[in-house]
């Protein structure tokens, strides 16, 4: 918590105006000798109007349960707002030198949540660091921080989460990655300058293992992933950080993401140095965009009054659960509504058990006409399909970013991917199984989820689900089918659509721990 006893004493002696100006900040963050940096004039964030806004530092300060954002690394709470971001994976070759430089030179470079929330305090390049389990062990840190999946590493769980290990990039195979630097800025030039500085500081104490450059897509596609859909709308509101909860946004305890905070299921057993850190799941997910587009073009939904192109757009929207604008199909079932999609006060405000077009005879446990049970956003956030006590423990904060170039003309013409592109997936959680692993293995890749529906084989998530790479059936994608040559239509919500292949393929990743600044200091001193 950020408020000290002295803060509350001040309440009785200062006016409100004086208090806002003079409130002391209680933090566990260690002192840092920062070299003065040039001031920014533009934010390093993108800010699509459809996405929730970040709070100001002043707004966080006013919260009764405010988090210690001076001590929390900047990437954990901000979500999917980076313009450009580099993931630099490394191994530690000389632990003693690395820890010495970590304390003296790297710690002052680490960007806090406080710094990232204002353009005036953002560095030219934001820097975060996280360590794998083998990385912590290599640095002499052997404490049990309460996560068996973190200890096992992602490679050992590849088949558990539906991956095919033969398709993994060799860099992620095994446990040789010890850590990752996350560098975010407006330009790759600024990122490369900061990376060169870090490499100069650490010298031969580290070895580069892998790197992946991510970037927001250009122009009107900013904020959209490579299939074209606006991403990042359904982030949870974090108590102690989020000052304005939007309609439909779920407020949850910070301990779902930050170790040792309220709501952390292992709050009492975490070592003190791990408090306010978070487990970072990284995944390199290739997206086969030309093939996805061709599939939609080949299988347009045959809906009265709709062209084939519109039918293809509807199929894609029903697979995702949102139109490309971000408008949810549950609220706009048959056509896109860009105004709705851009309105953060409406685009997330719905519940699957409340009909968008109210009908007393409609019970959405048995009706997927408006939104398929297996749609991507319903699989990962089944609002109303489950009780809050069943769903809320599995929230994650996504901090992903696209990577790779736009689809080339040659790829579009041939409907064949020739250039690697996709999503650098990042999620933060305080328990890897409750977060990423549960979502991927129990919900996304489970043909029977959402449980309790009439259809016993709903299918895997049509976007990121997998059954070993082969074809899989998804029910509910086509709500109407023609019944005769006069093109009469009837409801058939259980009609299966066969998806011939995976359009998203994992090439591996790793589990990391992103410590607080005080945690980084403790690791350096271990």
Curated annotation (Swiss-Prot):
Proregion residues excised on maturation:
22-63
- Protein's UniProt keywords contain Metal-binding: yes
Protein name according to UniProt: Dye-decolorizing peroxidase
Could you tell me what this protein does? Manganese-independent peroxidase that is able to convert a large number of compounds, but its physiological substrate is not known. In addition to classic peroxidase substrates (e.g. 2,6-dimethoxyphenol), oxidizes dyes such as Reactive Blue 5 and Reactive Black 5.
**pH influence on activity:** Optimum pH is 4 with 2,6-dimethoxyphenol as substrate. Retains 90% of its activity after 4 hours at pH 2.5.
Known catalytic reactions: Reactive Blue 5 + 2 H2O2 = 2,2'-disulfonyl azobenzene + 3-[(4-amino-6-chloro-1,3,5-triazin-2-yl)amino]benzenesulfonate + phthalate + 2 H2O + 2 H(+); 2 a phenolic donor + H2O2 = 2 a phenolic radical donor + 2 H2O
Principal EC category: oxidoreductase
Q: Where does heme bind?
A: 376
Q: Gene name, please? A: dyp1
Where do the coiled-coil regions begin and end?
Answer: none
The protein's GO terms of the molecular function aspect are: heme binding; lactoperoxidase activity; metal ion binding; peroxidase activity
- Temperature characteristics of this protein: Thermostable. Retains 50%-90% of its activity after heating for 2 hours at 60 degrees Celsius, while no decrease in activity is observed within the same time at 30 or 40 degrees Celsius.
So what family is this one in? Belongs to the DyP-type peroxidase family.
Carbohydrate attachment sites? Answer: 186, 367, 473, 484
Task: Look up and give the organism this protein is from.
Answer: Mycena epipterygia
Q: Which SUPFAM superfamilies match?
A: Dimeric alpha+beta barrel
Entry annotation: catalytic residues: 231
Q: Where is the signal peptide?
A: 1-21
